[in-house]
Amino acid sequence: MKDNIELTIFTPEKNIKIGEIKEVITEGLDGDLAILPNHVNMITYLKPTITKYIDLNGNKNNIFTSSGVLKVEDNKVYIICDASEKPEDIDIKRAENAKKRAEERLRNKKEIDVKRAELALFRSIARIKIKEL
C-alpha cells in the first residue's frame, strides 16, 4: 500500500505535473470528491472549481480547474480539463469581467445558450474565489 498519490493536470495548452501528494479534493457533477492513497480506480466528470491538494509537507495548495474529467488509477490522479491556472496566474480583472458578462447573458435569456453561460459563470467565480484565498 502506498502512502502518496501522484497528480497531473492536462489541458490543451499545457501539462502541469504536481507530483507526489497526500490528497486531492475537487468537485464532480455529484458533489465533492476526496482522493486519498489507495483510492479505488475511477473516472468521473468535473465541474469548474478550485481543486485543492495537500503536498507531502502537509501544505494546502489550490489550483483552478475547469470542466473536464478526473481519472484515478493505481495511485495516480489525472485531471483532463479545458483550462487550469495557479492563483498567481489568474487575471482577476479578466475573471471579474467574464463573471459580469455571464451574469448579463443569464439575465437576458433570449437567444443564448444557457448551459454555456452557466459554465462561463462557474469558471469566473472559481477564478475569483481562488484569488481571494
From Swiss-Prot:
Recorded name of the encoding gene: atpC
HAMAP family reported for this sequence: ATP_synth_epsil_bac
Annotated Gene Ontology cellular component terms: plasma membrane; proton-transporting ATP synthase complex
Organism: Clostridium botulinum (strain Okra / Type B1)
Protein's membrane topology: Peripheral membrane protein
Location in or out of the cell: Cell membrane
Quaternary state and interactors: F-type ATPases have 2 components, CF(1) - the catalytic core - and CF(0) - the membrane proton channel. CF(1) has five subunits: alpha(3), beta(3), gamma(1), delta(1), epsilon(1). CF(0) has three main subunits: a, b and c.
CDD domains in the record: F1-ATPase_delta
SUPFAM superfamilies referenced in this protein's UniProt entry, alphabetically: Epsilon subunit of F1F0-ATP synthase C-terminal domain (SSF46604), Epsilon subunit of F1F0-ATP synthase N-terminal domain (SSF51344)
Physiological role: Produces ATP from ADP in the presence of a proton gradient across the membrane.
Gene Ontology molecular-function annotations: ATP binding; proton-transporting ATP synthase activity, rotational mechanism
Listed name of the protein: ATP synthase epsilon chain
PANTHER family per UniProt: ATP SYNTHASE DELTA/EPSILON CHAIN (PTHR13822), ATP SYNTHASE EPSILON CHAIN, CHLOROPLASTIC (PTHR13822:SF10)
Gene3D superfamilies assigned to the protein according to its UniProt record, in alphabetical order: ATP synthase delta/epsilon subunit, C-terminal domain (1.20.5.440), F0F1 ATP synthase delta/epsilon subunit, N-terminal (2.60.15.10)
UniProt similarity note: Belongs to the ATPase epsilon chain family.
Record key words, sorted: ATP synthesis, Cell membrane, CF(1), Hydrogen ion transport, Ion transport, Membrane, Transport
InterPro entries: ATP_F1_dsu/esu_C_sf, ATP_synth_F1_dsu/esu, ATP_synth_F1_dsu/esu_N, ATP_synth_F1_esu_C, ATPsynth_dsu/esu_N
